[in-house]
Amino acid sequence: MSTNGNGNKNGEVLKKGADETSVEGLGGNVSGAGPSPESEPGSVTAGKAAPPPGKLTKADFSSDQEVRWCPGCGDYAILNSIQKVMPDLGIPREKIVFVSGIGCSSRFPYYMNTYGFHTIHGRAPAVATGIKASNPELSVWVVTGDGDGLSIGGNHFMHALRRNLDLNIILFNNRIYGLTKGQYSPTSEFGKKTKSTPMGVIDYPVTPLSLAIASEATFVARSIDIDVKHLSSIVEAAAHHKGVSFVEVYQNCNIFNDGAFESFTERSVRPDRVLYLEHGKPMVFGKNRDRGIRMNGTRPEVIQLGSETGLNESDCLVHDVHIEDPSVAFMLARMEQPEFPQPVGIFRDVRRATYEDLLAHQIEESVARTGRGDLHKLIHSGDMWVVE
């Protein structure tokens, strides 16, 4: 549906025929049989020829590119989940754009048979903002990582959230720099020893959900790479949200930070150490659903349910994703193992006018008031001079 790799250094969308990718005026190999996606940033990705009209499938969203993540990487599970969800959204592939920055996660657009931009470090939200503002009918997805999105890209990340463009931002959090081989990232734990911190990290880590909520994101959620059913449901909910959606995915880097989340994501302990948030339901967890969360003054606490304590589900805090005040969502985002179960699910889902709708309204108002502008007339008006 657009470029696959080398040759397009200008970020230009390439035209695709029935059987191959072609481009006018650009050099380099841009055919489907070209090099693997070790391309320069700024390129746009290409996939297969469009299928005949009809119901799309997961295969229709899989490009012809070899997936080049490390064997066992959590990114495979995320890719699989998103490709499964795409057909159910009912959006034509030519109306979908994936935008990435730099990092392992940023190879993502190459593997989606949609339009895509592989941009520069940390700038995916800025490029996505331009795409959505210029073409509001598109479904725009940003794929980033904890390094790309929260370090050099932190400023763009924050402003994309507060503006509330109708973007879907998926952040792969593995608490490490993977592509550059194991340096600490903004989400690495305090004291963690890495190649760039041999004596331990002395930075305090960013909590991505806290940052997203503080930046006024209207949809905030979290899932786990290996919990495919849950992840797929979260991605689908994010896609249906009108406004910016932010999804953090706990993703295992089995080469440079293996087991970063296994203390609570491993299947045998997950029921006791993960709290699955569900709108309108009490916050209950545990293999036997015998523990819950309630408020004790201004703080949450874990309570034991059952006849011994006389407490039951009615004593637990009931989750409400639609509360406009972000205080409870922020509190939940701060809950962490081992004191609390690790919350996953939708933390916040509220409605607010989107940036692109407000922008379109302003443009319509301006045109109605002063008429449609004439660029040629503007350039040739007023004092002018010629440099010879």
Give the label of every model feature segment.
Residues 100-178:
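Thiamine diphosphate
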Residues 152-153, 159-167, 172, 176-314, ...:
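Glycine-rich ThDP/TPP pyrophosphate-binding loop and its adjacent helix/strand module
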